[in-house]
UniProtKB/Swiss-Prot annotation:
PANTHER family: RIBOSE-5-PHOSPHATE ISOMERASE (PTHR11934:SF0). The gene is rpiA. GO terms for cellular component: cytosol. GO terms for molecular function: ribose-5-phosphate isomerase activity. This is Ribose-5-phosphate isomerase A. Catalyzes the reversible conversion of ribose-5-phosphate to ribulose 5-phosphate. The lineage of its organism: Bacteria, Pseudomonadati, Pseudomonadota, Gammaproteobacteria, Candidatus Pseudothioglobaceae. SUPFAM superfamilies: D-ribose-5-phosphate isomerase (RpiA), lid domain (SSF75445), NagB/RpiA/CoA transferase-like (SSF100950). CDD domains: RPI_A. Belongs to the ribose 5-phosphate isomerase family.
Length: 220
């Protein structure tokens, strides 16, 4: 089974977590795109969705799924999104596509967070995938220096990339994240950081992991 086939399978499985007649949250990225395509087959069962990026909103609308402004929504039943890495406690690194801030906001509002990924994303210690940090542009060099001094790793500005919020992304390479919650909090305390790609203080409730033998369900 190829990686795309595993993503397709977990996306189909995630439909079981979609609650009828509710508004759901939808993430951003290649696995989330598989889910959006799958969601289109049951779109009449839901009121619509809150999108975590402009790209996701466009894909939802292309499928005829109503997209809601989060400020006009009182509740989100379920948030479904992929991940760049997950540990066994369902702490995540997200934001490889640069949508981490909006993803984190929608995940915070949602009653439950279902993460969908292929088996390559499950690791014992996170950090092999560069950790994204969204920063205010004028603070980029200051934040880089603070990360080098206080966190470690190698922070680099992502070239030719601006977030939907008009900000820069710093990617921190060569990390070993042994305490995800503490690192998430510490990074967010640096002036100029909007947020970082660690989803530990609000991790996933369920991880649907695509494997060659089917979908493995891990709960927290």
């Amino acid at each position: 089974m190829t990686q795309d086939e595993m993503k397709f399978t977990v996306a189909q499985t995630a439909l079981k977590y979609v609650i009828k007649n509710t508004i759901i949250g939808v993430g951003t990225g290649s696995t989330a795109n598989f889910f959006i395509d799958a969601l289109s087959t049951i779109k009449n069962n839901i009121k619509g969705a809150v999108a975590s990026s402009k790209a996701t909103a466009q894909r939802l609308e292309n499928h005829g799924i109503r997209v809601f402004d989060l400020n006009k929504v009182t509740a989100i039943s379920t948030y479904i999104d992929g991940a760049d890495e997950s540990d066994n406690n369902l702490n995540l690194i997200k934001g490889g596509g640069g949508a981490l801030t909006r993803e984190k906001i929608v995940a915070a509002v949602a009653h439950q967070f279902i993460c969908i990924a292929d088996e390559s994303k499950l690791v014992s210690i996170m950090g092999s995938f560069p950790l994204p940090i969204e920063v205010i542009p004028m603070a980029a060099n200051y934040v880089k220096n603070q990360i080098s001094q206080k966190i470690g790793g190698i922070p680099e500005v992502r070239k030719d990339f601006i977030t939907d919020n008009g900000n820069f992304i710093l990617d921190i390479k060569d990390l070993k994240i042994t305490n995800p919650k503490a690192m998430e909090t510490k990074l967010n305390s640096i002036i100029g950081v909007v947020t970082n790609g660690l989803f530990a203080n609000r991790g996933a409730n369920v991880l649907l992991l695509g494997t060659p033998n089917g979908v493995k369900i891990i709960t927290n």
